[in-house]
Amino acid sequence: MKRTEITIAGDSPGTSHQLTRFDIGPDDPTLPKIFLQAGLHAGEQPGMMILHHLLAMLEAGEQSGRLRARFVIFPMSNPIGMGQVGLHHHQGRYHLRSGLNFNRGWFDLFEMLAENGGLTNLAAALLSGSSD
C-alpha cells in the first residue's frame, strides 16, 4: 500500500490543506482500476468510516496477493469542510463568510462534455491514467 499526501494551497496566506491518497493492489495496467472517495460532503462521515475499515482489509488482501484490481482511495475528500467548526458544530458544507453551500452552484458541464465525447472518453482517460 502506497500512501501519498497531496498539499493544496489555501485561499489565505500561509494556509494549506492535505489530501491523503492510498494506492493498493497490483500495479498492472491490464487489471481494473477502482476509485473510491468519501467525505466529499464533509459532515457525512459514514463513508469515511467504511473506507477506514476497508483500507485494512485491502492491505491484508494485497499482502496475501489476493487482489485482482488496483484501488485508488481518497478517504476524506474535503479537508476544507472537515476543518470548519463553529460554536461546537460542524459547518463543513458552508462558506463561513458568504453562507454559500459548497454542495450547490456547480458549473453546468453538459456542453463541455457533449463537445468532447461525453463521459465515455473521460472515464476511459481516468481508467488508463492518462492526463489528456
Which residues are covered by each model-predicted region?
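Structured catalytic-domain cores with a bias toward divalent-metal coordination
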Residues: 1-132
